[in-house]
A protein has these predicted regions:
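The feature captures the conserved acid-bearing segment of alpha/beta-hydrolase catalytic domains
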Residues: 178-245, 250
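N-terminal cap/lid segment of alpha/beta-hydrolase-fold proteins
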Residues: 24-66
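Serine-hydrolase catalytic machinery in alpha/beta-hydrolase-like enzymes
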Residues: 48-58, 66-146, 263-267
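Solvent-exposed loop/turn segments at secondary-structure junctions
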Residues: 76-80, 104-108, 157-160, 197-202, ...
Length: 297
């Protein structure tokens, strides 16, 4: 009788535990796919969304000059980190202006909230954040100092994945949060710079071609261990497939490099600054900005 009682307890404990796990996973995936299919996203006009975002812009320009090549920068899933400020200084020192876009702050997301919801894929997926990209690009005429022939996009991790999603957008596949998307209003993008993106199942580039074959440079990390989200092999397979007919994506697999290898400032365990890889990326980026040209955007 005693053993029977113990087995009954074990059986029902297992059923309850399994049910809880099922409910938790069901809740998670329902939120992920609700975002994917635009079921839980507030939709706005691009000009209103630009005004919503711009109060959190970090703009850095060179001291001398009137018009500058400009890099529009999109941070990783946890929000802006100081290493992006270092990149802005680097750009400025090389005669390049930059706008660092904060996608978390205007939405009221703290660092902890962003890590919990955005990094997990529950909130602000790439096709929604692509609306941030569109809203900014279509309102750059407010800045007279931008050289409109030399606009570049740059993204880190979630920001890189966002830019890849944005490149798939057209009048039939629009950002999930924009009411008035029109691809003819997207200005010429001279090039795209991305670091350690998510190239897996939620990345729209897995299913849809890019709107234009905009020249792109990508830096991957061979020791990237940010879960399954940023496996470099996913990106290598995807980029090789995209480059089959015409090569327009150059990627580099950085040796002895972790996720966010370009941050001198400590972020978390498992992320290590690699100066050699960062310097390599800097040299490639400057060369890319000076020589790149979009073929059909």
């Amino acid at each position: 009788i005693f053993m029977y009682f113990i087995l009954r307890i074990f059986k029902w404990s297992f059923i309850i535990l399994f049910s809880l796990i099922f409910l938790i996973l069901g809740n998670y995936f329902s939120k992920v796919f609700a975002g994917y299919y635009r079921l839980n996203v507030e939709q706005v006009y691009a000009s209103d969304h630009f005004n919503f975002l711009k109060s959190h812009f970090e703009i850095v320009k060179p001291e001398l000059g009137q018009k500058f090549p400009t890099v529009i920068m999109f941070h990783a899933c946890g929000g802006p980190y100081p290493y992006l400020d270092s990149w802005q200084k680097f750009f400025s020192d090389n005669g390049i202006a930059s706008i660092q876009v904060d996608s978390a702050g205007p939405r009221g997301m703290t660092r902890r909230t962003a890590i919990r919801t955005v990094c997990s894929g529950v909130d602000l997926q790439g096709q929604e954040r692509a609306g941030d990209v569109y809203s900014i690009l279509t309102n750059l005429n407010q800045y007279s100092w931008i050289d409109k022939e030399n606009i570049f996009l740059a993204g880190w991790s979630h920001g890189a994945y966002t830019l890849m999603d944005f490149m798939t957008m057209n009048d039939n596949l629009i950002p999930s949060n924009i009411l008035d998307f029109d691809q003819q209003f997207i200005p010429k993008i001279k090039g795209k710079i991305t670091f350690y993106p998510h190239c897996g199942i939620l990345n729209l580039s897995q299913k849809y071609p890019w709107r234009t074959k905009t020249p792109s440079i990508v830096f991957l990390a061979d020791q990237d261990g940010f879960g399954l989200a940023t496996q470099p092999t996913d990106c290598i397979d995807l980029f090789d497939s995209m480059n089959k007919e015409e090569k327009y994506i150059d990627y580099y697999l950085m040796e002895n490099s972790t996720h966010v290898f370009d941050s001198e400032i400590y972020i978390r365990r498992g992320i290590v600054y690699n100066k050699e890889s960062t310097d390599f990326a800097k040299n490639k980026i400057i060369s890319f900005i000076k020589s790149s040209g979009s073929k059909d955007n």
